[in-house]
Amino acid sequence: MSISSKIRPTPRXPSRMATDHSFKMKNFYADPFAISSISLAIVSWVIAIGGSISSASTNESFPRFTWWGIVYQFLIICSLMLFYCFDLVDHYRIFITTSIAVAFVYNTNSATNLVYADGPKKAAASAGVILLSIINLIWILYYGGDNASPTNRWIDSFSIKGIRPSPLENSLHRARRRGNRNTTPYQNNVYNDAIRDSGYATQFDGYPQQQPSHTNYVSSTALAGFENTQPNTSEAVNLHLNXLQQRINSASNAKETNDNSNNQTNTNIGNTFDTDFSNGNTETTMGDTLGLYSDIGDDNFIYKAKALYPYDADDDDAYEISFEQNEILQVSDIEGRWWKARRANGETGIIPSNYVQLIDGPEEMHR
């Protein structure tokens, strides 16, 4: 049996967890940007509707299309509050941005018609729609940007829940790891510290700066005694096997006196082989390599992290693990974008670092 048939990733069906989207007012109260901007929008809308009603009640002419713009703005404000209460803002970002852009056009058009009109009542209505236009422009900047953008990160830093996860940033990290994965035996990546020591580290986490022809990210514990960190892994392994075959054949010729014993010795070369540094049990699969993480002691998981958001592992990635919001995870490595972690049920794998927060003591677990 060849080595290529021995080292294969063991598929794992990750658990899928549903995110809670029930109606909760605390989702709205926990976001200072939502409270402040929507409160200002409500005040501006009251000024606009009050001035419009006062102007229309007199004999003064009033632009009729402004009424639809005011009603449309009211629907936008109500929709935003509902999206926050059900925690669906990230799911409807495109809809929110486009609908607010339409409201911006309506209010700007109404301001053009009212700002040049005479009378204090129309002046109040024009002030209201101008304020609404400014707020709509701020909303377009926020909801139109990704959560990883500098402005969104700065605004979300004041939120009680912290910075929102970025789907774009997450997909770039996954694409980077998938792009480094090849089909040769030693190129099935188990994401670990070797990615930083292999000589192919990148300056930007989103895209590789240098794409190696071979990547050697197999656990050094599983391959103790015959690992090779040079790029030409397959050639090095072939040379190593040839040398072992010559040594075993020489020993077999000296000991064995019949052809049956020689055939048995040659057959065992493809299955297992011993080196001066091995323990005689080097028959390891990629599934066993993943299993080694389950045997790591508690001392190696010296950090604890609290999940800020629920995370569903990617179906195409056997090494990610899912976790729930506020779940406490044990972490063994806190460098890079993806951390090695272990759940309370013993499940181990990698997790995105921007979904969790390190905690120092038991009092932070209940925050």
From Swiss-Prot:
Cell compartment(s), UniProt: Cell membrane; Bud; Bud neck; Cell projection
Transmembrane segments: 33-53, 66-86, 94-114, 123-143
Keyword Transmembrane helix: yes
Any one of the GO BP annotations: regulation of actin filament polymerization
Phosphoserine carried by residues: 166
Cytoplasmic side: 1-32, 87-93, 144-367
Topological category with respect to the lipid bilayer: Multi-pass membrane protein
Key words, A-Z: Cell membrane, Cell projection, Glycoprotein, Membrane, Phosphoprotein, SH3 domain, Stress response, Transmembrane, Transmembrane helix
Gene3D superfamilies: SH3 Domains
Chain segments carrying region Disordered: 252-276
Extracellular topology ranges: 54-65, 115-122
Protein name, as recorded: High osmolarity signaling protein SHO1
Subunit structure: Forms homooligomers. Interacts (via the SH3 domain) with PBS2. Interacts with FUS1, STE11, STE50 and RNA polymerase II.
Composition-biased stretches (Low complexity): 259-272
Residues with attached carbohydrate: 59
Organism: Saccharomyces cerevisiae (strain FostersB) (Baker's yeast)
Residue intervals of the SH3 domain: 300-361
